[in-house]
Regions:
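Catalytic core of pol beta-like nucleotidyltransferases
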Residues: 1-24, 33-34, 48-106
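Short beta-strand->loop micro-motif that forms the acidic, two-metal-ion catalytic signature
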Residues: 40-47
Length: 106
């Protein structure tokens, strides 16, 4: 990842953790694999201690927008509770496989 992408991720993480200090964030997808093109988005798994609701999703989406706006990077947060991620059907999904194989914790 580029220095700009790394700084965007740091800014995003700091913003999310202001409200959700226990949040775990993992980059996955083409930018994590290193095969992104300039138009690729930045996929980020966000795992929270609590069940996300509409306000949670709106807040995290706003954090993503704010972090990526100036440098022109589109962040795409995918949000789950820790319980959903570790024990729900997503545990065996293609998304979970991709995160396990290529994910970069931030």
């Amino acid at each position: 990842m580029t220095k700009t992408e790394q700084q965007v991720l740091i800014n995003f993480k700091q913003s999310v953790r202001k409200r959700y200090p226990g949040a775990n964030l993992t980059v996955f997808g083409s930018r994590a694999r290193g095969d992104a093109d300039p138009e690729s988005d930045l996929d980020i798994l966000v795992v929270l201690d609590t069940q996300p609701n509409k306000q949670t999703e709106e807040y995290i989406s706003q954090c993503a927008w704010d972090a990526g706006f100036e440098p022109g990077i589109v962040l795409v947060p995918v949000i789950y509770s820790k319980t959903e991620w570790e024990n729900g059907p997503e545990k065996h999904s293609l998304l979970a496989t991709a995160v396990r194989e290529e994910g970069i914790p931030i």
